[in-house]
Amino acid sequence: MSEKIRVLLYYKYVSIENAQEYAAKHLEFCKSIGLKGRILIADEGINGTVSGDYETTQKYMDWVHSDERFADLWFKIDEENQQAFRKMFVRYKKEIVHLGLEDNNFDSDINPLETTGEYLNPKQFKEALLDEDTVVLDTRNDYEYDLGHFRGAIRPDIRNFRELPQWVRDNKDKFMEKRVVVYCTGGVRCEKFSGWMVREGFKDVGQLHGGIATYGKDPEVQGELWDGAMYVFDDRISVPINHVNPTVVSKDYFDGTPCERYVNCANPFCNKQIFASEENETKYVRGCSPECRAHERNRYVQENGLSRQEWAERLEAIGESLPEFVGA
């Protein structure tokens, strides 16, 4: 039986001098021990997800904790059967979380170490979910929400996190005087976003400490009131959260049946994320529209080595056709 792989999710807001140099040093160490993953390092802190066997991940955690700046860094640990990443990336960025404010090119003046929302543990957050007078706001991207979310949480009419501040400004009159609690995957986005909400004048702002990942592992709440699965930015794509009464909320793009399997549209110029069963992926050659299904650079066709005749037959079976110039 192969050894389990550990996936580490973590972040910390802390001042890092010479962050660009530290990023290079960090990458060198990660590669030297065979770690895989993706890490962002900025002047304001560090944010990463990495994976490896027990020995490798333990070496990494010990090395990180040996730096006094990260001595108390909180690693959230999952156990999996296979690697969550194929390569190792460490990138220097201006920020580990960018709010995309029009009046502020960078968000360095929003320092979570100085201004942030009240930390709520899983039990307190569950109580907030059950409180009719509390507004629960999902701060993630739309495709993350669609895979899974807390019951009753607001889904902002946005595509990505950078659009959220403007959405809040446009809708602040609806919940300015109410208690607002926010959540995200591991907590890093909420640290900064809840601080921004406080700066905007919201009087009572809370955040799920440790994010959804921590809520799902809490022995008392066990992920209850979470519907669906949690989206993660690695090869796993999704992980279960609700261990009490799990449900599937996402629906197959093609037939509307329950489905948690995310794929990217095979048209490289579209790349839209859609839910699709293996059967429907095959049937629709992973294209989200007739144009994408017949696109000359359809990746599903290329990956599966379909001949032009096989491709045309797939499309004919669903009432579509392949233009003469495509695949000729």
UniProtKB/Swiss-Prot annotation:
Query: What is the catalytic activity of this protein?
Result: uridine(34) in tRNA + AH2 + O2 = 5-hydroxyuridine(34) in tRNA + A + H2O
Cite the PROSITE patterns for this sequence: RHODANESE_3
> Which residues are in the Rhodanese domain?
130-224
Per its UniProt record, what Gene3D superfamilies does this chain match?
A: 3.30.70.100, Rhodanese-like domain
SUPFAM superfamilies xref list = Rhodanese/Cell cycle control phosphatase (SSF52821)
Pfam families xref list: Rhodanese, Rhodanese_C, UPF0176_N
Name the EC number(s).
1.14.-.-
Active site located where?
C184 (cysteine persulfide intermediate)
- Sorted UniProt keywords: Oxidoreductase, tRNA processing
Q: Name one GO biological process term.
A: tRNA modification
CDD domains from the UniProt entry? RHOD_YceA
**What GO annotations for molecular function exist for this entry?**
oxidoreductase activity, acting on paired donors, with incorporation or reduction of molecular oxygen
- So which domain of life are we looking at? Bacteria
Main role?
Catalyzes oxygen-dependent 5-hydroxyuridine (ho5U) modification at position 34 in tRNAs.
> What protein family does this chain belong to?
Belongs to the TrhO family.
Record protein name field? tRNA uridine(34) hydroxylase
Organism, scientific name: Streptococcus pyogenes serotype M3 (strain ATCC BAA-595 / MGAS315)
